[in-house]
């Protein structure tokens, strides 16, 4: 594999702030030369690749010792970027890592753009686009199941499936071309309408099956957006805090104290549940509270799941009935809170099974998790250990386009169109799938994707 010629880049690869270790990473042809200028220890040009080397970082202009470090020296092509890589392991801290980064830049490196290390890995053929995106998914994963899907994608499970399908499509196209250009050849199977239809239906079934994993994959990657709704002071914020096991929302006896939308994540059965505690939906003259109410209504419309909290110790109010009405078309769980008090709510007016809870006494909170599990996971068979999942919106959109293109081929065959006229749609399918792996992705898309990465990755 021939790597492209790039300048040498540098960035801090660890989160900013205090920590045990901070890492300044360099990648490029001059990585070793730049590091050698500021490192006092072994000659990095002579050490074995993939070794850690003890020494000190020295400012060559002043002779000042900046820090005691371990320098990782990795020579191309067996590195993440397929370039020479230096990783300076410093004591963690904003000042020391920044000063060492500035030294590297002063001696000839350029400050890396967000995601530029991974972008170089892609451009140099170390990873394809799906694997590069998986790197960010691993960083952002909130549960073990989300991380497992990202790791499988990084290992190439999706890439292999897409590449194998593209190769089969290419073989079919080649067969059609040979039949058109060299009809006298008997060694090649004739690309009849029946043969092409069988192949395209096979491709369509494969991609459709992959699309069926999208809902589960998206849930695992992004979580279930869950709006906690109810009139003011029924215990929404207390429920949020109970589920999170920590105080995040303002909990008082004063109606209207949650004036905005509060978002937090909780792990339910290995799946991230994005809990959105909304301001109580009611008529109010308070401008700030009005904004919170409008945001609550928006969160309700966009939620995958609605937890409607009612006060079991009070009769249903007009606001309760309004919330029951506007949430009836959603995935909804009705919670009767404050069951530690005498129950006066009219349960006969409630349209479905409810869960009786007492947030104050921590009663039946586990039943909420059980119901969520039944709603989303149990019947769907959430995770198959060896399955390949679609979870990325870009991938899902492109697979949908590829399926549409294959359907156009099959519709054309049913109408009796000649096979050679349908090459355009079959070729388009091949190109669309190439956008997923990056083989046919435009430069603008690649730049936009990597710009979403963090610095130093």
From Swiss-Prot:
Its cofactor is K(+). This is tRNA modification GTPase MnmE. NCBIfam families: mnmE_trmE_thdF, PRK05291.1-3, small_GTP. CDD domains: trmE, TrmE_N. Its main location: cytoplasm. Keywords: Cytoplasm, GTP-binding, Hydrolase, Magnesium, Metal-binding, Nucleotide-binding, Potassium, tRNA processing. It comes from Streptococcus pneumoniae serotype 4 (strain ATCC BAA-334 / TIGR4). Belongs to the TRAFAC class TrmE-Era-EngA-EngB-Septin-like GTPase superfamily. TrmE GTPase family. Gene3D superfamilies: P-loop containing nucleotide triphosphate hydrolases, Probable tRNA modification gtpase trme, domain 1, tRNA modification GTPase MnmE domain 2. One of its GO terms (biological process) is tRNA methylation. GO terms for cellular component: cytosol. Residues 223-377 form the TrmE-type G domain.
């Amino acid at each position: 594999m021939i790597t492209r010629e790039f300048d040498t880049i540098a960035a801090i690869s660890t989160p900013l702030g205090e920590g045990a270790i901070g890492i300044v990473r360099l990648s490029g042809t001059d990585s070793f030369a730049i590091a050698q200028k500021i490192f006092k220890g072994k000659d990095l040009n002579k050490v074995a690749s993939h070794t850690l080397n003890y020494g000190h970082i020295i400012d060559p202009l002043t002779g000042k010792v900046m820090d005691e470090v371990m320098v990782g020296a990795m020579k191309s092509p067996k590195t993440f970027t397929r370039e020479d890589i230096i990783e300076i392991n410093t004591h963690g801290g904003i000042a020391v890592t920044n000063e060492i980064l500035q030294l590297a830049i002063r001696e000839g490196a350029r400050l890396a753009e967000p995601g530029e290390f991974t972008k170089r890995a892609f451009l140099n053929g170390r990873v394809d686009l799906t694997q590069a995106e998986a790197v960010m998914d691993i960083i952002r994963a909130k549960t073990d199941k989300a991380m497992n899907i990202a790791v499988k994608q990084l290992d190439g499970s999706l890439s292999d499936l897409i590449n194998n399908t593209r190769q089969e499509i290419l073989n079919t196209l080649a067969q059609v071309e040979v039949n058109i250009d060299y009809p006298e050849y008997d060694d090649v199977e004739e690309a009849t309408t029946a043969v092409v239809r069988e192949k395209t239906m096979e491709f369509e079934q494969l991609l459709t099956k992959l699309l069926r994993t999208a809902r589960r994959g998206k849930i695992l990657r992004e979580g279930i957006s869950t709006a906690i709704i109810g009139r003011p002071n029924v215990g929404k914020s207390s429920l949020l805090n109970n589920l999170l096991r920590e105080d995040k929302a303002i909990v008082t006896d004063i109606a209207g104290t949650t004036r905005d939308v509060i978002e937090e994540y909780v792990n339910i059965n290995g799946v991230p549940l994005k809990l959105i505690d909304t301001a109580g939906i009611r008529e109010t003259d308070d401008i700030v509270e009005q904004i919170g109410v409008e945001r609550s209504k928006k969160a309700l419309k966009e939620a995958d799941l609605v937890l409607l909290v009612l006060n079991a110790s009070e009769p249903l109010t007009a606001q309760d009935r309004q919330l029951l009405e506007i949430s009836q078309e959603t995935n909804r769980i009705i919670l009767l809170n404050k069951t530690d008090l005498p129950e006066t709510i009219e349960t006969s007016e409630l349209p479905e099974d409810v869960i009786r809870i007492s947030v104050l006494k921590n009663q039946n909170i586990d039943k909420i998790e059980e119901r969520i599990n039944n709603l989303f996971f149990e019947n769907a068979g959430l995770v198959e250990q060896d399955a390949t999942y679609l979870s990325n919106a870009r991938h899902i959109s492109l697979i949908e386009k590829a399926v549409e293109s294959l359907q156009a081929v099959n519709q054309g065959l049913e109408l009796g169109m000649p096979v050679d006229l349908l090459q355009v749609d079959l070729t388009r399918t091949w190109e669309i799938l190439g956008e997923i792996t990056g083989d046919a992705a435009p430069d603008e898309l690649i730049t936009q994707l990597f710009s979403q990465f963090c610095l130093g990755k």
